[in-house]
Amino acid sequence: MLGTSGTLRRTFLYAFAVAATLVAVINALNVITISHEEPQLGLAGPLVWEGSSWLTLVLFFWIPWIGYRLAPPFVRPRWRLLAHIPCALAFALCHVAGFVLLRKLVYWLAGSRYDFGAFLPHFLYELRKDSLGYALFIAGFALIEHLLRQQQLIETPGQSFTFDIRDGAKLTRVSLSDILAVASAGN
């Protein structure tokens, strides 16, 4: 799943760490906001709601990764990007079904009952949020992989960076350290 490249493994792990941290912060802010705006709800409910959402998001983070590996943002042919539609739907469905099941379990253990309401309208609401999250995860994967590959280029020993000069059919490679200035012939 992660590939044999160390870059891909690190891309997934760094993205996972960043996503888990950012979503935890957002969920903590949601708990604070709910507790402030509706103090009659207490703290337990919002903690269970936001905690179950965070946990299932983390558990199903591999789904956007699969989508990214199937169709990175700059993939050719472009129609392959359509692979993100079923992946985003699967991610949202697993996230929502997962947190609903966790909430039902926690409420049951506490001697209570959790009611998510009508599934379709609530799922469509969550789908919009999860689709945005999915897109941000894909962008995060692309950014992190790009940065890691750039770092890898810099750290490669003995590598000299060159600038290609084309003059008709002739190609001249000049070491970047030998270039003082670049000007165009106006073509």
What are these regions (language model features)?
Residues Q151-N187:
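Conserved binding/recognition cores within well-folded domains
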